[in-house]
Each structure stands twice: as structure tokens, then as C-alpha cells.
Amino acid sequence: DAIFVRSEGVQFSTPWHQDEPYWSVKGFDTVSIWMPLVDVDKKSSLAFVPGSHRWDKNYIQQDFGELNPDNEEGVDTVNFEGEWEKFPDIDSNRHEFNVISWDMKAGDCVAFNARIIHGGGGKLSSGRDLKVFNTQWLGKDVRVNFKPYGMDPDHSVKMKNAGMNSGDKVDGSIYPEFTI
């Protein structure tokens, strides 16, 4: 779970990315839930490339650890260099990629697969801030997958201490398990 906060006047867009490559897991049955705690204009809201979670592509993701203007210690970093390909130029071709986003009221939610390409507009209107609660959910096909390029957040130590190894099912010993 995470809370994202941007102060009034911030004009920073969250780069296009997918969530799963950052995580210590791999699997298709994943859901991220993004819930603004304040009203959000469409231009500031999360935007998506519909259907991109079904593309069989690995893209070079943004290292969010680089976005650390205060140079804080212990910030998780990743390095996606190597066999991954660059993201397509979505911003210059938004219509071609059918990019979608919405005005959202406080408490509205959008749920999406962790492999879908998404990013934040980040263009906050005058007098507006952005506060978002985000949570991730994992399904039965999801397995532990420690990644050599790093993870953000990096739960690998916690998972290894709980006896989990790459290929194992993520169990409820450190992550709550819900039966629906």
C-alpha cells in the first residue's frame, strides 16, 4: 500500500510505466487500485493505454529512485537496462494509443492490471493538490520473482526471511490473504 502526495502547483508528470516490473512477483492475476482522496481533474488523473497489459513486451521502466531531489538515503532503485525495449512515444501519439483518463471524485477508484501501461498527468490546477491511496492485490497465479535489476518497493529481504524463494506462491505469512 502507498500514499502519493503532490502539493499545489506541482507540474510533474508520472512517467509511463507498468507496476509489475518493479515488484518482487510475477503473474497476470494482479490488480492495483488507485483511489484519490481529493477530487482530481482529468488532466491530473492517472491515464491508461487500454489493452497494453496483454502486450508481450518488456519495457525499460523509469527508475523512480532517481526522482529523489532530497537525496534521501535508502531509496529503492532499479536498473532496467539490457534486453528491455524503450517505451513507444505515447505522449506524441495519444490518439493512436487510445489513451484514457477521467475526472475523479474523492473516493472514486480505478482498478487495473499491474502490467497495463499507465502514467499520471501531474498538471495540477491552481488551488489543487493530489492525494491518492494505492493498494495492490495478487491472485493465485502470482509467484515470487526476485529481480536482478532491483525492485521498488524492495520486499525481497522480508520475503526471504519468511522462507519465500523465486517461484514460490506468495503466502499469507507476511501479506494478508483474503478468500472471495
Give the location of each predicted region.
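Activation segment
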Residues: 7, 57-58, 120-121
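Non-heme Fe(II)/2-oxoglutarate
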Residues: 61-64, 106-111, 115-180
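Short, surface-exposed loop/helix-turn segments at secondary-structure junctions
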Residues: 18, 82-95, 127-129, 148-153
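Conserved hydrophobic/aromatic beta-strand scaffold that supports enzyme active sites
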Residues: 2, 32-36, 99-101, 109-111, ...
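Double-stranded beta-helix
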Residues: 42-117
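Glycine-rich loops and low-complexity Gly/Arg-rich segments
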Residues: 22-29, 39-41, 57-62, 71-75, ...
